Amino acid sequence: MSKILVAEDNPPNRELIREILEACGHEVIEAGDGRQALDKLEENLPDLVLLDIQMPVLDGYAVVREVRKTPRLATLKVLALTAYAMQGDREKVLEAGFDGYLTKPVDMVSLSKQIAQLLR
């Protein structure tokens, strides 16, 4: 299926997301912080990035800004994974350059739907 980079600093969350994605047949690349995410993007060009907003070293906003200004990566689909669920958070995430928004805790149905929409 698709190659997906999961950038999430919380190991149990990252493991859960990896298990869901692998069960759906996706190849998973993992990163534990924003800097690692950018390094992994240089090594592997995935079909999609699942990017936590709150991460050490570089947060998700800094990573998506870097992705959007890098010609080779600019059209890459990036889905925000966030605990932020207040009014206006979704709009802020989309305005920052993300292609989609999913709140945590992540459930398999919502994640699968978002991935299918973004990979069309």
Report residues per predicted region.
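Receiver (REC) domain active-site loop signature in two-component systems and cognate sites
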Residues: 55
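Conserved acidic carboxylate
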Residues: 8
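Active-site beta3 strand of CheY-like receiver
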Residues: 44-50
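C-terminal output helix
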Residues: 106-115
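Charged docking surfaces used in two-component/phosphorelay signaling
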Residues: 15-23
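Helix N-cap/capping motif at the beta->alpha junctions
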Residues: 30-39, 60
